[in-house]
Amino acid sequence: MKQLTVLFIMINFFLSAQEKESDEIAAAASNATNPLAFVTKLQLQPNHTWKDNDASQINITTRIVQPTGTLGLPFIKSKDPSKVYTIYRLEVPVISQTFPNATQFDATGISDIVLLDVVAFKQKWGLVGIGTGLIMPTASPKILGTGKWSSGVSGVVLNTKIKGLQYGVLFQQYWSFAGDADRQDKNFMLIQPILNKVIAKGVVLAFSPIMNFDWENDDFYIPISLGITKVFAKNLSMSLTPEYVVSGPTEGDFTVRFQINAMFPPSKN
């Protein structure tokens, strides 16, 4: 009888541990693909784009995502950080491009740094975020950037009510306001539809192409993409996403995106 009791306790402990691990993996999968998750993220994202005329571009972006219990600015505290908080996102891209059969210049160096500041509001069905963005002309050599200071607005709507499914949209609109007078002014919008579906334990299928509408030149860039994210632990995920431009001046460009995403509990501030 004692042996059966011990066996029962061991089985129950094992099942509880398995259930806890499964819940942690599910939570990590949700956090990895949710742009408004209250989780600190350190991401490394190498992208390789193949263009016409044997041209190519490698873009390695380092991204830091830091949530805080504030309202837009670090010194304005949220009354209820569990429902209203701020996400700061800093992107630092390093680009290497080659154009062997074109008039554009080969170059390698840092591109423009991007900073987003989004206030997130939790809803019964998901999340809403609204904020600002700043593009800094940090490119060196200058050919790798816009040469302009640009700022604008950003917003996110994300439905997370259904377990294992996220859908919504993220947009950013920028206007240039200063910078190199010899460079063209900037007025463009980025729209990113978001559709993430858990298809297996720790595996997420993601549709999230970034469309670019260049109002200044009356152009647009429409890609299609389908990526897969694998969560290896409660604090680590990797994703692979092929992307193809189906319409616009860069039609036919093919990009492979790879991302390593490390997640940490946010600082308590």
Q: Where do the model's predicted regions map?
A:
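Transmembrane beta-barrel domains of Gram-negative outer membranes and organellar outer membranes
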Residues: 19-269
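Bacterial Sec-dependent N-terminal signal peptides
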Residues: 1-19
